[in-house]
Amino acid sequence: RFTMAAMASPGRDVKLAEERIEGYRNFTNKIWNAARFLLMHLDGERAEVPAAQRSFPDRWILSRLTATIGTVTQELEQYRFDRASSAIYQFIWHEYCDKYIEMIKPTLKDQASEQAKSTRQTLAETFETMMRLLHPFMPFISEEIWQTLPHEGASIVRKPYPTVRADWDSQEAEQEFSLLEECRGLMN
């Protein structure tokens, strides 16, 4: 389903390629691995901290998530399922898994710190929102993962679709991260 949505550009015939299906299978594996990582860290205490007071990586991922929600919502309203699925793919694979999870691993090693508690909250909050965002495209996988996580309600279907949250928007964190990426690029 996700593969078909990603390939469904208006006015274009879909040429189903086995390589594309394999690529999105790998994406599904990435989601499962992110869920396993989350489950390893959910047993610790979490802290309810306002988004503006969270760490740099936490503010950055929440800002990227709310921007992705805005993009996906806009693309779905225009029936651009290809662009909506691409935005979800880019966020989950490249921002959440490749960058955010790698940035927070050192923080999560000290389980008792206030920083770790806040980061666990952001990790869980972001993943839960990602599953609701992904659900129309991958309903079976998102539901299966949802059932393994602590949650309220019987099903992910009963949860509201994510909306843009102004309190998560942090242009400052995004600019800092862009600068960090530029510096990293210069060093390589």
Model-derived features with residue positions:
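Catalytic adenosine-cofactor/nucleotide-binding cores of aminoacyl-tRNA synthetases and other
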Residues: 1-54, 150-152
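Core structural elements
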Residues: 5-6, 26-39, 56-68, 86-107, ...
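Acidic, turn-prone loop/beta-hairpin segments
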Residues: 44-73, 102-188
